[in-house]
Amino acid sequence: MNLWHATSPTIWQGRNDLAEADNALRLFQTVKLSPYFTPEEFSHYVALLGFECDEGVKRNQGRPGANQGPDYLRQSLANMASHKGHDKLVDLGSIRANPNQLSEAQQALSDAVTQCQCQNVRTLVLGGGHETAFAHGVGIYDAFPHQRVGIINFDAHLDLRRSPQPTSGTPFRQLAEYCQQHQRLFHYTCIGASLASNTQALVDEANRLNATIIWDNQCRETMLDKVQQQIQDILQQVDLIYMTIDLDVLPAYQMPAVSAPAALGLPLERLLQLIQPICQSGKLQAADLVELNPLFDIQGIGGRAAARLAWQLAHWWY
């Protein structure tokens, strides 16, 4: 497959505790590592797919480095304990973008996602900048042409920018246009957005598209019940969910390893409270974690936070 490569076995390394007990397992021992892109061999698994691309971040005037995110996240995951759901993970490698060829890389990821989904393999994509979302979303729409797809984006930014070329700030505007072209419902919710980080033009665009915005300061602990009810309402309106988590939705002290660290953000514990019902709804078909930039991590804090999110997501998914 174009631009695809297998993950090196050296990425999945960790502490071996099997001398203690047969079930003293870690992810590096239970994640299946495929040398070929063969989703047909892993029906009812969750595929880890890397998207080694930050071309969209560069175009959006961000800090490059997210192309190194997928393997960094894999390494952070490798030594975590393996529990329920983690034995259903298979690493199906990564798409590696060539310089200045964003559209080609996005097409390759879309094709890979569609192939997985058509083989009953759910997709957990590791970005990469948030340009990942356009490719992942198109892959889902193409795999499920007759289903109502809901997009839930946990993100400090609405990512509905107007731009002469695709960037990490345009994916949901692109998906809205894709839906219009294909006569599909565009059902978009952004949770954790910062009003301080989104211009009025972006808010107006969200309103034009009938998007739902739940601002970061509406996700305080005392307001979680209301947010949870909003999430339940969203789940009732669609057949399946594509959930995308831009790691800059976390506060900077928990996630320094992004292009645009958040001054406020949603703390990791609160974010987990919000994603749990989505993961356990039976409607989550695809998810990704994007914008992880190892070049700006501090003592591995960001890598571990991202890994805990991915670990928890997989644990709740099955």
Curated annotation (Swiss-Prot):
What's the cofactor?
A: Mn(2+)
Q: Which PROSITE patterns match?
A: ARGINASE_1, ARGINASE_2
Q: Which gene encodes it?
A: hutG
Looking up SUPFAM superfamilies in the UniProt record yields: Arginase/deacetylase
Which Gene3D superfamilies is this protein grouped with? Ureohydrolase domain
Which sites bind Mn(2+) 2?
A: D155, H157, D246, D248
Q: What is this protein called?
A: Formimidoylglutamase
List ligand-binding residues for Mn(2+) 1: H130, D155, D159, D246
Keyword list, A-Z: Histidine metabolism, Hydrolase, Manganese, Metal-binding
| Catalytic activity line of the entry | N-formimidoyl-L-glutamate + H2O = formamide + L-glutamate
